[in-house]
């Protein structure tokens, strides 16, 4: 008798994706982040669901409803902080996953890569609207500043901003719709993740060497299920350590002050995971130019497959490209640091130089290094 997992219409799909999936035998721990992102998403949806049961999306009660969750709801404090720090873990895994893709040439799978970029935008949108919900000072002013950027769009800008706000400023209508968006977007992310996996399973996984591994595949279960469980345990350990020992480490103290439209915080800045993009936005002294640079800083990822000039897929055997990749990582860390600093000397010039280097590395230096490596290896 054939095994039910191979014949049942639903179990067959799960089996082909997570049990009998032929997987390269040499994929490293950098390949763990995909499953960790899935775990983060499920955690965020579950904690978010329980928070939504007690939260009220109204300007007069939003802040106090979050306080109520932390003080009066059974284990509300841990649910709230797991959700807030879970977002940070989500972005850590996301950036590691993207870095892995960039380093080992996963962008050669065009469809998977492009769905990944759409997923990144969706996750960023979800995190942004979610940050507005506690209705603290940074929530309010963050929403005001970021939505206001759309007013830089010629002709329709102002109308567009007021349409998003649902009025002439960030107010009750804005909060209500942001809550609605924050509730629906994770399910859109879930659907897009399915599409991401469908495209990935069309080609099979890449591996550290970047060489076709069809002749050396092993079943996903038990080899990679056990490896993923280890990764998951380490992620849960990190999340719980952060949540239980330093829940506010990555947050902003200003968000413990209720939103006040009449008082602007000294330094308006987003959460840490958006600081690199915020630094790029601020490094251009023109509103429209800054907005375009902000968009391009992420959209540039869509150009990466077209800029892949190397004859080898992975950077594993390409020392010049490896060096530039780590320069890019250092540059992004520098931008993240600058994004959290006030707009004054020397931070302004450092931010501008780091922004120029970011675009220069991806558009010019890395493709050029690949061509030089081709020449040196007489490929």
From Swiss-Prot:
Biological processes per GO annotation: mitochondrial electron transport, ubiquinol to cytochrome c
Binding site for heme b b566: 97, 196
Residue spans crossing the bilayer: 33-53, 77-98, 113-133, 178-198, 226-246, 288-308, 320-340, 347-367
GO cellular component entries: mitochondrial inner membrane; respiratory chain complex III
GO molecular function: metal ion binding; ubiquinol-cytochrome-c reductase activity
Record's subcellular location: Mitochondrion inner membrane
Binding positions (a ubiquinone): 201
Annotated cofactor note: Binds 2 heme b groups non-covalently.
Major subcellular location class: mitochondrion
Residues annotated for heme b b562 binding in this entry: 83, 182
Record's bilayer topology term: Multi-pass membrane protein
SUPFAM superfamilies: a domain/subunit of cytochrome bc1 complex (Ubiquinol-cytochrome c reductase), Transmembrane di-heme cytochromes
Source species, domain of life: Eukaryota
UniProt cross-references to CDD domains, sorted A to Z: cytochrome_b_C (cd00290), Cytochrome_b_N (cd00284)
Keyword list, A-Z: Electron transport, Heme, Iron, Membrane, Metal-binding, Mitochondrion, Mitochondrion inner membrane, Respiratory chain, Transmembrane, Transmembrane helix, Transport, Ubiquinone
Subunit structure: The cytochrome bc1 complex contains 11 subunits: 3 respiratory subunits (MT-CYB, CYC1 and UQCRFS1), 2 core proteins (UQCRC1 and UQCRC2) and 6 low-molecular weight proteins (UQCRH/QCR6, UQCRB/QCR7, UQCRQ/QCR8, UQCR10/QCR9, UQCR11/QCR10 and a cleavage product of UQCRFS1). This cytochrome bc1 complex then forms a dimer.
Additional detail: Heme 1 (or BL or b562) is low-potential and absorbs at about 562 nm, and heme 2 (or BH or b566) is high-potential and absorbs at about 566 nm.
Family stated for the protein in its record: Belongs to the cytochrome b family.
Function summary: Component of the ubiquinol-cytochrome c reductase complex (complex III or cytochrome b-c1 complex) that is part of the mitochondrial respiratory chain. The b-c1 complex mediates electron transfer from ubiquinol to cytochrome c. Contributes to the generation of a proton gradient across the mitochondrial membrane that is then used for ATP synthesis.
Name of the protein described by the UniProt record: Cytochrome b
Name of the gene: MT-CYB
């Amino acid at each position: 008798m054939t095994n039910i997992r191979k014949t049942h219409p639903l179990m067959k799909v799960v089996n082909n994706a997570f049990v009998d999936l032929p997987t390269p035998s040499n994929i490293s721990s950098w390949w763990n982040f995909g499953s960790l992102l899935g775990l983060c998403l499920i955690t965020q949806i579950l904690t978010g669901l329980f928070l939504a049961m007690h939260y009220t999306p109204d300007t007069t009660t939003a802040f106090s409803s979050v306080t109520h969750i932390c003080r009066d709801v059974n284990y509300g404090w841990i649910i709230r902080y797991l959700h807030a720090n879970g977002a940070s873990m989500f972005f850590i895994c996301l950036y590691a996953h993207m870095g892995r893709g960039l380093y080992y040439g996963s962008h050669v799978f065009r469809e998977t890569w492009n769905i990944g970029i759409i997923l990144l935008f969706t996750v960023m949108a979800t995190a942004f609207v979610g940050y507005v919900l506690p209705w603290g000072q940074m929530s309010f002013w963050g929403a005001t500043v970021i939505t206001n950027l759309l007013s830089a769009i010629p002709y329709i800008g102002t109308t567009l901003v007021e349409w998003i706000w649902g009025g002439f400023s960030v107010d009750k209508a804005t909060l209500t719709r942001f809550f609605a968006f924050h509730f629906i977007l994770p399910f859109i992310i879930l659907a897009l993740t399915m599409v991401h996996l469908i495209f990935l399973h069309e080609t099979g996984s890449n591996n550290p060497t970047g060489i076709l591994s069809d002749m050396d595949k092993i079943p996903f279960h038990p080899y990679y299920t056990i490896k993923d469980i280890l990764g998951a345990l380490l992620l849960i350990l990190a999340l719980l350590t952060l949540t239980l020992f330093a829940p506010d480490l990555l947050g902003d103290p200003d968000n413990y002050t209720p939103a006040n439209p009449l008082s602007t915080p000294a330094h308006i800045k987003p959460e840490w995971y958006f600081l690199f993009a915020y630094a790029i936005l601020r490094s251009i002294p023109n509103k429209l130019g800054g907005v375009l640079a902000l968009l391009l800083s992420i959209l540039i990822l869509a150009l990466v497959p077209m800029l892949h000039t190397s004859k080898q897929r992975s950077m594993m055997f390409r020392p010049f490209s490896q060096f530039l990749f780590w320069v890019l990582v250092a540059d992004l860390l520098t931008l993240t640091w600058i994004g959290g600093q006030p707009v004054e000397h020397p931070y302004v010039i450092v931010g501008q130089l780091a922004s120029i280097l970011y675009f220069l590395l991806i558009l010019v230096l890395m493709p050029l290094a690949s061509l030089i490596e081709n020449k040196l290896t007489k490929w």
